[in-house]
Each structure stands twice: as C-alpha cells, then as structure tokens.
C-alpha cells in the first residue's frame, strides 16, 4: 500500500505561523538585545533565520542567529555509522543571553536534550527556551516547547516532513501515513 501524504501546513499557513511565533518570542523577551536564536541543523537553521527576519520587521531590531549541530551530543551515537564534523556556528558568547532553540519538529525530545548539552559549551545563558514549528507528541524526556507553531498528534509509525524554501525549494509541512 502506498503512503498517504497529507498537507498539514501550506506556504501561507507557515508564513502566518512564523509571524505569530515571532510575536510570541517578542512578548516573552522584553530586552531583545539579549536575545539569540539558535537553529538546530538542518531545518531549524532556516526557520531561525526566518524568525529573525520577522522580529526585525516587527521591532526593527536585528537578532543574532546561530546554528547548532547536535550530532556529537546525541545519546544514540552507537547507531550512527558516520560522524560528521560539527557545523555549529554561534556568533557570540551565550553567557547571560536569552537563547531560543529553534527546531522544525519535536518528537521524543532527544535532539533537544543533545542541543541543551551543546549550548552549555558556548557559555551559560540566562535562560534557554524552545520553539518548534510542529509538536507531534510521544516525548521520552520531560521536555516541552515554550513556543509551538502546530500541535499535531501522530501515531508512532507516521512521519512529519517539513520542507522549506531554503533548502528544499518549497514551503510545506506534510504528514506521511503508512
């Protein structure tokens, strides 16, 4: 039986969702000069850049954006055959900053746990918050996003795929069943 693909978010819905999320981040961070967005590779990075653009449009403030590679911090390294060099790029010390980790989908919470471990190597932030475009549930760790674009209850065997203009050439979120 062929997989069934259901569009969950259209390009317009993604745009509106990112605008709403940017507004929520602004509301929660009165001093935007202390804010840093860290996108988690792969699709968290372009999402973080889009959020920074939205914040700049709304508040005329440039927010620094970094990229974090959690590969070497994962607790399932034994299952990973190849280890790539870390692609982490953080533009400044995180000590005293208000960090928002940005990821496309949260599932079990293991990627976020790895990201938290990675962040502490770049300083001691004042606070770390989590923003995710899609929360599909099924957490194995006590991790809960502070900002969520869409809550999407799924079955364990289903997949959620996020496609973004950069790097995929289109904006859409799909649920894949079967």
Curated annotation (Swiss-Prot):
It catalyses: UMP + diphosphate = 5-phospho-alpha-D-ribose 1-diphosphate + uracil. This is Bifunctional protein PyrR. The lineage of its organism: Bacteria, Bacillati, Cyanobacteriota, Cyanophyceae, Synechococcales. It comes from the Bacteria. Its EC number is 2.4.2.9. Regulates the transcription of the pyrimidine nucleotide (pyr) operon in response to exogenous pyrimidines. Also displays a weak uracil phosphoribosyltransferase activity which is not physiologically significant. It is an enzyme of class 2 (transferase). Substrate binds at residues 42-43, 83, 103-111, 136, 160. It holds the Pfam family Pribosyltran. PANTHER family: BIFUNCTIONAL PROTEIN PYRR. GO terms for molecular function: uracil phosphoribosyltransferase activity. A motif (PRPP-binding) lies at residues 99-111. InterPro entries: PRibTrfase_dom, PRTase-like, PyrR, PyrR_bifunctional. Belongs to the purine/pyrimidine phosphoribosyltransferase family. PyrR subfamily.
